[in-house]
């Protein structure tokens, strides 16, 4: 007979994705996300990855506000929304983080900007770097890579390598930032595969 402690541990280790569902609100934005992703990334855009990112950011609530001030479906901070709109005025125009169409265009555009600045040993690892940067800033990713390399770790691998190194974040920010790519790529991406491709299928069972 299992002790309560062991039973609790085994229960905690069960795949959390079994209870995950796509929110009802997501369907109304599906077509807009697909169109925006194809426009920026082409027909091979990882739709499931983008959808999982929105799921993690706002659970598809266009009016979402975080305690620290992030706004809309893609949870842009005001300064980041203004910056990305200024960087791509033709594609994005005036920043409108609470406008679902603008938020989804801005998310896939910012992800592309980050993707172009992050190399990795696999596509899954590359997206983990991208998502870490989306959550905490590219500067932190660069510093974490340098620290990992100086410590003898592979700076081109995120999982079980760079993700272990903290170049100076607070404990809370570090924990949030490390959970962010894993939740999106290893937990939520798979529930959106009916929408399109993901990038981390080889790691779903790890």
Regions found by a protein language model. Give the residues of each.
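N-terminal hydrophobic alpha-helix used for membrane targeting or insertion
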Residues: 3, 46, 165-167
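Non-catalytic cell-wall polysaccharide-engagement segments
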Residues: 13-32, 41, 82-109, 113-206
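A Zn2+-metalloprotease active-site environment signal
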Residues: 38
């Amino acid at each position: 007979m299992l002790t309560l402690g062991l039973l609790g541990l085994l229960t905690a280790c069960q795949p959390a994705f079994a209870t995950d569902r796509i929110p009802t609100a997501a369907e109304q934005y599906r077509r807009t996300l697909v169109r925006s992703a194809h426009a920026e990334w082409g027909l091979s855009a990882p739709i499931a990855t983008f959808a999982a990112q929105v799921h993690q950011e706002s659970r598809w609530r266009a009016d979402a506000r975080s305690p620290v001030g992030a706004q809309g479906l893609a949870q842009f901070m005001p300064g980041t929304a203004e910056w990305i709109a200024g960087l791509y005025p033709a594609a994005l125009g005036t920043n409108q983080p609470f406008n679902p169409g603008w938020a989804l265009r801005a998310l896939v555009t910012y992800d592309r900007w980050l993707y172009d600045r992050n190399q990795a040993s696999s596509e899954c690892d590359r997206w983990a770097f991208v998502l870490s940067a989306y959550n905490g800033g590219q500067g932190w990713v660069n510093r974490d890579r340098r620290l990992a390399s100086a410590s003898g770790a592979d700076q081109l691998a995120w999982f079980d390598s760079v993700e272990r190194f903290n170049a100076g974040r607070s404990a809370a920010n570090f924990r949030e930032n490390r959970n962010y790519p894993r939740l999106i790529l290893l937990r939520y991406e798979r529930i959106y595969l009916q929408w399109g491709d993901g990038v981390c299928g080889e790691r779903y069972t790890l």
